[in-house]
Amino acid sequence: MGLTRDLPTQASTQSIAFRVNGSAASSPVAGAAVGNRMVRLDGKRKVDGSEIFGADETPAGALAVRAIRNPHHRARFTFGDLAKFVRDHPGIEAVFTAKDVPGVNCYGVIGKYADQPVFAEVEARHRGEAVAAVVGDAATVEALQVADFPVVWQELPFIQDIDAALAPGADRIHENRPDNILVRGRVVRGNVDEAFASAEVVAEAEYETGFVEHAYIEPEAGFARRVGDQVEIQACTQAPYMDRSDIAAILGIAPERVRIIPTAVGGGFGSKLDLSVQPFLAVAAWHLAKPVRMVYSRTESILSTTKRHPARMKLRAGCAKNGKLMALDFAADFNTGAYSSWGPTVSARVPVHASGPYYVPNYRALTRAIHTNLVPAGAFRGFGVPQAAIAQEQLYDELADRVGMDRLEFRILNALDETTPTVTGQVLGAGVGIRACLEALRPRWKASRGEAEEFNSTASGPLRHGVGVAGMWYGCGNTSLPNPSTVRIGLKRDGRIVLHQGAVDIGQGSNTIVTQICADMLGAPIERFDLLSGDTAITPDCGKTSASRQTFVTGRAAQMASELLRRGILDLAGTCECATLQFDENGVTVHEGGTSHLVSLEALPLDEHGYVITSEATFDPPTSPLDENGQGNPYAVYGFGAHMAEIEVDTELGTVRVLRVTAAHDVGRAINPTLIEGQIEGGVAQGLGMALMEEFFPGKGENLHDYLIPSAGDIPPVESILIEEPSPIGPFGAKGIGEQAVIPTAPAILNALHDAIGIRVRKVPATPDRVRAAILASKSVNGETRG
């Protein structure tokens, strides 16, 4: 029996299989999974080491693949005698270059902007770009000296900063993109100029943020093999179906002839949405018909993969004397590097969000993604919104100070609600929890502000304390674009439930969350499920793991598919909707009123999927396109939050220590509070790094010695406050949390820095040298003695 429901379109096919094994201590009773702090379904495997990551498997006889990369910021190149190189190096089996790509030597995450070659053809546009791949036995490939490879480089003038890229007469990074502008973003509402003319208080500022490396624990890795006229790739990824489409185009074959099998992922944060090892593996496996394996070193990973966009932002805000916001004018340029990657998404998402979660009746936000000869900037937890929050939340503090308002109360006064339109004109109607988040911080805010003032008033040494706050909002899913998820559920003759869901769990817990949702919709215990996740040959397409969409979108599709399966069982039993189901080793028992009926499954015929009943549902969040002024409904659901940071500053050294973070987040419904708290704590850690230490300099910091990330000693206690303002269309009211958790941390810390010592660091991160320089500059302006 097959049951399908599409809302509104699309199904395909994806998986890693494992049986859910629970215990009385770890698994909730039937019907009580949602809201339960059950342990992750893959938790034991991660702890005992049995989980399979990208580098953990090597097929028998697999050859090693190694990329030859451009060592310069920009260079032309020519090859010597590659055939002779292979002959002269026993153990090397082949060298592949652009001419060996069977299909299109171009890929990209957004089709119309695709511009990145598998192998550069004549010119390498950035340091670390691949020009060739060497394939051979592992020992020989690993021992190969790059200087022995026959390639001659001709260094070319290069562009690294936005001003140089935009300068008249600047070299074009891509001939078809005048002025090196990849794309522009725009949201305009009301009359900004008139509003500023009547605003009683105005503040303006400029902020700059740098490159940030993802620094996940697992560098990119995987293997591939050709199976007849198909190719299979097992690798770490956030987007198996996107990978499949790109690899098919690169090989010049139909997508159905490419199978992507995601491994467990040791962190992604957006970078593993882009291809890494996959094209090299695919080309080598296709030509050689042998298994091939590739594992990036940490240096290679940092050198060649995407980063958070550096941003240069200029903004101005105005309000009335009572603190009500009247206008915001925001302009930002993002350094998108040599190739497009997710630059268009960043440019589109930021103008929607740069107001923050506040009612701003007159608004203008203009963005540009600018090409340079740097490693591509791509997706990184928040798609540019964390950069915008750093600017807008500090400016709102300045406005609050100028009107003499408490900084938290200023935000509460201006917070969006269910009836006020956003800057795109969208009225959300329900599920707007920003005011509740801000109000949840109020007791701690008042107490901490008093403690900091008391400390500073009696401090005789260089230490000062400060408290800062910042709000956030974030749309779940793609911006005004379709982003459906399809989930299939099958009931076996023995009463076990097989969940086919293609959402890749990159550490956030989607395998567990989606299973909890299905369990409660069916009234089944977690132990009755077998989970298949993230394999393009086995599970339907659940879209990419990004944009805080999996709990909301895939979770909703799973809820719908579970509802269909339940109806199918009730139809078999001939009972009404009010009946309840009991799943156990005997099959399924239907309870209605005072009677019970065992549904016999063993005699039922199997459908095309091998189940007695199969249900499938697709959910695509309802959005609308934005018009030329960015007006419309870009997201169906938004997550909201607010963070408060307490810090200590050493005014002699310029060092900042975060003492505590209190984080309030509107999650709609907390499907698994423990997993949500984990996301919040991880977001705080990344936000702290962005605020105080993380900055990547190409060619200078391609290792984790020179590139600083927070260590355990840097992470403060984090108090998480979960607010539940349900979304009418989320599964059990749930929203996303993955990206929301990182956005307000950095601005809260930077606002606390100003609260402590009265300075603003306009270029982030606020490293000790920058903090110290700002202190000295402030003393100079105020006529104090330097020291």
Role assignments for model-derived ranges:
Residues 264-289, 293-294, 510-517:
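Thiamine diphosphate
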Residues 2-182, 202, 287:
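Flexible, low-hydrophobicity surface segments
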Residues 170-251, 415-496, 703-721:
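Helix-loop-helix junctions that connect adjacent transmembrane helices in secondary transporters/permeases
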